[in-house]
């Protein structure tokens, strides 16, 4: 890739726009593709993404476009920020154009009917592409406002990791590398569920002890499940694990937190999602994660509890009673209990 060749960003949402701006600020021409031609035209003319990043100026180096074919043909490095429900249908018809290209997923979600992560779908669509993921405690608006931020690029392709670091690393954005693509990506997808729980807890006025307990036990659940699927537990002590979990469960800027907060205020799930106005991946992830945890017999009481509230007609008080009266457990799964007398 030369400096003159555009980097592609697929998706017109908040995170795709924030990454497009970062790339342009670092001197790289960017083509940001979006499905809606009216949105692309509006962003071209007004230099702003008012629906998803209102008040943030779109860098002059970002070219909003609606021609997917030309975008894919003209770029060797492509950042994919499409909703999990749309990624396969958008890219599968153009699989031949992706051969040998660098594809970096920015989407923190799981495909409902396959339980595949986004990078696994990319690998299936384009087996000869170079695949990576970018994940971490990365609120789009804060990135766009140049708050000091760090993230993780994960791939077994060291050259791809270096390439992503080179194009994104800057004065306010630091990029670390990892070889645990599966763990990094799974952490980003799973934490969305717990952000919904955290938002509910805040809306209901629960104390600091409760919020701390929720985040810590969420990390335990995430790690337990991820290790059962082959991830490295140490990944969850890094930016893509506990780092992402903390920011998503603590910030009103988090989309999934906002959904949970609305639920805690008494809105229905449909009303909460409608108020948000964009995709909250945690709602979709919850359904497939609950089923998968049952299938592989991994203990995930917070996931089961939230699912019971949203989809099984259980009340919050019933779920809290069940969780607090459950059989006592050891704190950390990876510490041996053989030392007990």
Curated annotation (Swiss-Prot):
Annotated NADPH binding sites: 14-15, 35, 108, 140, 255, 279, 281
UniProt catalytic activity: sn-glycerol 3-phosphate + NAD(+) = dihydroxyacetone phosphate + NADH + H(+); sn-glycerol 3-phosphate + NADP(+) = dihydroxyacetone phosphate + NADPH + H(+)
EC number(s) given by UniProt: 1.1.1.94
One Pfam assignment: NAD_Gly3P_dh_N
GO cellular component, as recorded: cytosol
Pathway the protein takes part in: Membrane lipid metabolism; glycerophospholipid metabolism
Annotated GO biological process: carbohydrate metabolic process; glycerol-3-phosphate biosynthetic process; glycerol-3-phosphate catabolic process; glycerophospholipid biosynthetic process
Positions bound to sn-glycerol 3-phosphate: 108, 136, 191, 244, 254-256
Active site: 191 (proton acceptor)
PROSITE patterns attached to this UniProt entry: NAD_G3PDH (PS00957)
EC supergroup of this enzyme: oxidoreductase
Subcellular location: Cytoplasm
Membership in a protein family: Belongs to the NAD-dependent glycerol-3-phosphate dehydrogenase family.
Protein task: Catalyzes the reduction of the glycolytic intermediate dihydroxyacetone phosphate (DHAP) to sn-glycerol 3-phosphate (G3P), the key precursor for phospholipid synthesis.
Designated name of the protein: Glycerol-3-phosphate dehydrogenase [NAD(P)+]
Recorded name of the encoding gene: gpsA
């Amino acid at each position: 890739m030369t400096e003159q060749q555009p980097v592609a960003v697929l998706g017109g949402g908040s995170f795709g726009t924030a990454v497009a701006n970062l790339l342009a600020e670092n001197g790289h021409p960017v083509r940001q593709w979006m499905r809606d031609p009216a949105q692309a035209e509006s962003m071209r003319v007004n230099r702003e993404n008012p629906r998803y990043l209102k008040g943030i100026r779109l860098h002059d180096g970002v070219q909003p476009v609606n021609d997917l074919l030309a975008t894919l043909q003209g770029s060797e490095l492509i950042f994919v920020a499409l909703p999990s429900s749309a990624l396969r249908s958008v890219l599968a018809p153009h699989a031949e154009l992706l051969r040998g290209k660098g594809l970096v997923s920015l989407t923190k979600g799981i495909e409902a009917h396959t339980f595949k992560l986004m990078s696994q779908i990319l690998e299936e669509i384009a087996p000869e592409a170079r695949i990576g993921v970018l994940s971490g405690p990365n609120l789009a608006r804060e990135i766009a406002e140049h708050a000091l931020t760090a993230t993780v690029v994960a791939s077994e392709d060291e050259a791809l990791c270096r390439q992503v670091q080179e194009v994104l690393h800057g004065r306010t954005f630091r990029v670390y590398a990892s070889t645990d693509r599966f763990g990094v990506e799974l952490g980003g997808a799973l934490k969305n569920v717990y952000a919904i729980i955290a938002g509910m807890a805040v809306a209901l006025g629960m104390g600091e002890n409760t919020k701390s307990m929720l985040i810590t036990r969420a990390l335990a659940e995430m790690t337990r499940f991820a290790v059962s699927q082959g991830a490295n537990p140490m990944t969850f002590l890094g930016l893509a694990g506990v780092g992402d979990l903390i920011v998503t469960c603590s910030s009103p800027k988090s989309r999934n937190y906002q959904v949970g907060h609305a639920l805690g205020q008494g809105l229905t799930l449909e009303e909460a999602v409608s108020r948000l106005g964009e995709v909250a991946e945690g709602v979709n992830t919850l359904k497939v994660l609950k089923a998968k945890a049952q299938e592989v017999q991994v203990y995930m009481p917070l996931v089961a509890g939230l699912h019971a509230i949203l989809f099984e007609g259980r009340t919050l008080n019933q779920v809290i009673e069940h969780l607090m009266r459950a059989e006592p457990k050891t704190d950390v799964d990876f510490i041996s209990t053989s030392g007990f007398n």
